[in-house]
Amino acid sequence: RLATKTRTLDPTRLIGAALEQSSFEGSATVKTIHDPFANVVDILSFNQYIGWYEGLPERSKEITWKIDINKPVIISEFGAGAKKGLHGEKTTRWTEEFQEYLYEETLKMIDQIDQLQGISPWILVDFRSPRRPLPEIQDGWNRKGLISDDGQKKKAFFVLQNYYNNKN
């Protein structure tokens, strides 16, 4: 009913719903999208955290996507946390190198989605979040930003900037 009402108010506005409705069905490397609202929405949208909540960034190299619904796709969230100025190996969580590596691998992976029409990295700037208590890393901040809370660009910012600059 909400989609119907929205279309009566503004028939030009596209409708989507960001869902995490994907699974590995029959294969550990094929992620299948299931969208219970597919018959209602104009855009398929889902959050994607392979390499952050699901394994390490190199896991992205193995993944392909199965999307049988013929609609445009927008990745509504993806990313990883990094504390500005914390450096180390690219496989060490919370370092700028880890976040940078995750962005590199994620962008290569999602570019293989035929219907991909847009992405929304999570998130541009670190922000206060009381549910982020990890001492000396989070300290009450969501650190998934590409820019630190004091305005400094993290390494992953430049990966995304380069990605956009190379798009036609």
Q: Which residue ranges define each predicted feature?
A:
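Non-catalytic beta-sheet/beta-sandwich ligand-binding modules that flank or precede catalytic cores
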Residues: 29
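Substrate-binding clefts and catalytic carboxylate motifs of secreted carbohydrate-active enzymes
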Residues: 2-26, 34-168
